[in-house]
A protein has these predicted regions:
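Short, charged/polar surface micro-motifs in flexible loops or helix N-caps
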Residues: 51-54, 82-87, 208-209, 236-237
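Short gly/ser-rich loop at a beta-strand->alpha-helix junction or flexible surface loop bordering the NTP-binding
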Residues: 43-57, 61-64
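Amphipathic alpha-helical recognition patches that constitute DNA-binding helices
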Residues: 76, 131, 199
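Conserved nucleotidyltransferase catalytic core and NTase-mimicking acidic/glycine-rich helix/loop elements
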Residues: 162-237
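Conserved NTP/Mg2+-binding pocket subregion across the NTase superfamily
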Residues: 3-23, 99-186
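Metal-dependent nucleotidyltransferase catalytic core
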Residues: 11-39, 58, 65-126
């Protein structure tokens, strides 16, 4: 069993935000409180991604292709509800955003990004070992727990289930890779546009990255986070 799977199955989810600066902790407490007020049947609010792992980027400015850009990691948050929020999800997220950014400098303040799952769907994904959701359980921080439900453990899948999951992963990643490859070909042939021509290398890297990501997803049902092609090649051996 992978350490990753062990953590997801047997180690309780983290609850402490002590590793984050006070400003970040305050933001996350505020967001959890607003979510509970705006969504009445919320059962869990989970921080995942770079802020959960402690690998976040607070502010990074650089110049790429002659354009000055800046990057900030988002607060990635999974909102688990009794039933999916549904068609009005974006409206709900907009209200949460509006309240959170009140009296804040929106352009240079960490933004929240939300996804929503019902507790039933979330637990089904955990039982089947869907790597995205299993990773959230293993690495995430529980910001709010109603205590009304327990999270499922990964169970042993039969070969039919393994095949279905692997096929879905393959279709998605292979489609992404081919999409990047087609755009790269078009850009390479369009030498009249220097920017498009220069972007070809980046697009080819994205295509190769997605092709390589597909292999461990299909054979291990695991998605590596690395973007280095050499590391992904090693993972495929």
């Amino acid at each position: 069993m992978r350490l990753f799977d062990f953590l997801a199955n047997f180690v309780p989810m983290k609850k402490s935000l002590a590793y984050l600066p006070e400003e970040k902790r305050r933001d996350l407490r505020q967001l959890a409180a607003i979510i509970r007020e705006e969504i009445k049947d919320v059962v869990m609010v989970i921080l995942y991604g770079s802020y959960a792992r402690g690998t976040y980027v607070d502010y990074d400015q650089r110049t790429e292709f002659g354009v000055r850009t800046y990057y900030m990691s988002d607060y990635d948050m999974l909102i688990v509800t009794k039933r999916r929020i549904g068609a009005n999800a974006q409206s709900v997220y907009g209200r949460i955003d509006g309240r959170f950014f009140h009296n804040k400098a929106k352009g240079f303040h960490t933004r929240p990004e939300f996804i929503n799952e019902s507790i039933g769907d979330f637990n089904r994904m955990l039982e089947k070992g869907q790597y995205f959701y299993t990773e959230i359980k293993a690495q995430g921080v529980m910001l709010y727990d109603s205590k009304d439900y327990k999270l499922a453990r990964r169970r042993k899948l039969d070969f039919t289930e393994i095949g279905e999951i692997a096929q879905r992963y393959f279709i998605k990643k292979f489609a992404y890779a081919n999409g990047f490859l087609e755009i790269a070909k078009d850009n390479f042939e369009n030498k009249e546009s220097p920017i498009k021509y220069q972007m070809t290398a980046f697009l080819l890297h994205q295509a190769a990255e997605n092709f390589l990501h597909a292999i461990p997803l299909v054979f291990e049902l695991y998605g590596y986070k690395d973007h280095k092609l050499s590391a992904l090649l090693s993972a495929c051996k």
